[in-house]
Structures are given as C-alpha cells and as structure tokens.
Amino acid sequence: MKMTPFSVVILAAGKGTRMYSDLPKVLHPIAGKSMVKHVIDTVKQMDAKQIHLVYGHGGDLLKTHLKTEPLNWVLQAEQLGTGHAMQQAATFFADDENILMLYGDTPLITAQTLTRLIAAKPANGIALLTVELADPTGYGRIIRQNGSVVAIVEQKDASPTQLTICEVNTGVMVASGASFKKWLSRLNNQNAQGEYYITDIIAMANQEGYSVQAVQANTLMEVEGANNHLQLAALERFYQQTQAEKLLLSGVSLMDPHRFDLRGSLQYGKDIQIDVNVILEGEVKLGNRVRIGAGCILKNCVVGDDVDIKPYSVFENAIIGNKAQVGPFARLRPGAKLEAESHVGNFVEIKNAHIGKGSKVNHLAYVGDAEVGENCNLGAGVITCNYDGANKFKTTIGNNVFVGSDVQLIAPVNIADGATIGAGATITKNIAENELVISRVPQRHIQGWQRPTKKK
C-alpha cells in the first residue's frame, strides 16, 4: 500500500531559559551536532514532502546555522504554546497530506519509530507517540477509554487520579493536514498556563468520533528532550554509549566504551584498537589494523592500514598513509598528507604539507606549506619559515635529503635530491643536488674566561 505523502513540522521557537545561554535551546549540540540538526537529518531519511521549521527566539542564529537545509521557515513571534506554534504553520498544510509534528530538542528520535507512528495513523484520526515512565512528573498523562486515547492532561491541570498514570505524551503526533487545520482553528487558552495546547485536539477528535491511537517509543531516551545542561549531558552519554556498543559489536576494540566519543561518522576496517578518551569528529575513515592511543582527537581524517597513532595527538583534515607512525603529542593541521611508512614524532606540527614515503620528522619541528620527498630526515627543531607577516610561501624538499637539527628554511626555497644541511643553518637560497650546506657562526674559544659574579 502506497504511503500518503507527508510533511513535517519541527517546533524550535523556545528560548530554553534553563540553559542559561544566549544560544537558542535547539542549537545546543549532541555529539558535535545541534539538536535540531539531528532531528532534520532523521526526517531527511524519510522522504518528507516538506519540512516546516517554526522559529522564534534566536531566529537569526538558527537561519545562519541551518542555511543549507531545505526548510520552510515559519515565524512564531510570541511563544504561546505548542498549539499556537502549529497554528502559524497550518497555512502551509495541504488537506490531503499527513502532518508529522516533532520537536527540535528531541535529537535522538529515530526514523524507524516515526515510520511506525505514521503507519499507525487511522483514517481522519490521530496517531500519538507515547512512553511509559516510572516517574511521570511533569509530563502530560495519556487518558484512555477502552484502549483508545480520549485525552491528554497536562501536569498542572491533572486530577490526583490522573497524576497516577504512567503513560505519558511525548508531544510527537501525526494527523492529516485537513484535520489539523480544522482542530487548530478551535483551540483556546483556557488553562492554568494561558497557552494553546496542541493536546486539546485529542478531545476534539474523540468528540467527532475519530480514532486516536498511541504508539509507544522503543526507548525513553529517543523521545527525551533537553531543557537544561544536565539533561543535555544525559542525552550525550546515552548517544555515545549507543555508538560505542555498535562499534564493539562490529569488531572495533574500545579499551573503555564509557570514555570514547564519536561526534560524526566513522568508516573502519578490521582489527581497530582505540584507547581511552579518544574523540572522533566529522567524517573519519580508518583502514585495517589501525591503533589509536589515549587522548587522541581526529577530525575529518583518512587513515590507511597499519597506522600507529600514539597518545595525545590531534589531527584535522589530514590524510595518513599505510604503516605511518604519528605521535605522541603530534599535530596534523588541515592539508597535512603523510605517505606510507612516514614518521611524525612528538611535538611536531604539520600544516598544508606533504611528507613523502619513508620520510621522518621525529622531534620538535614545524613543517608548513611544504613538499617533502621520500626517505628524508628532518631533525629536531627544523622549521619551515613560511610566513612573512603578510603572505605564505612554499618550501620544496627533494628525495633523500638530510636536514640537521635547528635548521630554519626561509621560504620560498628549494632543496634538491640528496642534499645535506648541517645543524643550525639558516637557509635562504636554493640548494643543488647532493650538496652539503653549512651556515653557522664560526666557533670561538676564549681562554681563561671569567664568568660574571653576583654583587653582594
């Protein structure tokens, strides 16, 4: 049976007072991505006809953050409740489509659950997403009669008997566009909060003889919202634990799944070993037999087979070839590319530079805007001086070059194959193939030198 076309409304107008932040609540991140972006990405998996986003507080920030998303922006100038928010969007509803109502601060909702909910919607009726809570305090209670939902009563309006009910409303629902428009036009704000409750349409549907069905979410956390940083942290931990469990079951070795964060997507081969406190951000791809030491951060990186990344190294937009060794305490900045079997050691920074196969930069060096050939050795303290305060220049180093300790290479400069540069040199001119270059102040010996003494 063909599914009725549907559109989505995401409510994202709230300020989030309890966040104590200038950032709109829905822009606070889970796993490095805003809560509302999680919801949008979930909806985009479902082939929705249109996504309406109801905004209010921090609208300019929201529009900047979501400028590339296919959204219809709907302004809610005053925040007068969920029903009022839906009223602002109702003018865009087609009568013959279903409308799925979601919240921008419930980031872990799944496409599978939402698909079940849409499939459960009765003709001309409503399907609600509910959940059972051990402590339902603060949530709207589901009132049933003969199995069907007849009302949702908010905490402040509930009777003592109704307060004992543990099945609660998640706020997520689906109905036809025609039904929503009809019921939304009848809402009033005669309640303790003086707001327009979307939940009042449940009673309207029942009065007209239309069925209201409830579908329960698979887990509480997928429908849990975040109104403060404590709840936000709980969602983050649940999300990270879920990601860690998926990786463990897929063969990835995590030394401690409670001390691992995935803030993006990960592609991986076999026999991956990840130590504690590793953070993977953006799009990360790991080959086979990759080892990542404790405390490393990788963002938007491609890592080949048999790579050993030692502890406390930080990489961003870098490519690392097979059998390379990096770290500890190494930094690869955007544009760094290490070929196979290369070594980058402790306290080395590589930026917008290509390190050739088998080359080594093992200690306390900076290589920026550079091309380094194969089987080179750059000693401790080597610096490519690539910036004159206004412009950047390139250093080119051929194959089989040896650069001694504490050498400054003043770009632009070319070092040909087989060259050797003595320690302490400052190189300002090109060096020919197989040349030895020494540039240092002659050593002086002063006999009988007396050191200064402190005055008493």
UniProtKB/Swiss-Prot annotation:
Source taxon at top rank: Bacteria
GO cellular-component term (any): cytoplasm
Keyword DNA-binding: no
Pathway this chain belongs to: Nucleotide-sugar biosynthesis; UDP-N-acetyl-alpha-D-glucosamine biosynthesis; N-acetyl-alpha-D-glucosamine 1-phosphate from alpha-D-glucosamine 6-phosphate (route II): step 2/2; Nucleotide-sugar biosynthesis; UDP-N-acetyl-alpha-D-glucosamine biosynthesis; UDP-N-acetyl-alpha-D-glucosamine from N-acetyl-alpha-D-glucosamine 1-phosphate: step 1/1; Bacterial outer membrane biogenesis; LPS lipid A biosynthesis
Residues annotated as binding Mg(2+): 105, 227
Cofactor: Mg(2+)
Family: In the N-terminal section; belongs to the N-acetylglucosamine-1-phosphate uridyltransferase family. In the C-terminal section; belongs to the transferase hexapeptide repeat family.
Protein name (database record): Bifunctional protein GlmU
Organism: Haemophilus ducreyi (strain 35000HP / ATCC 700724)
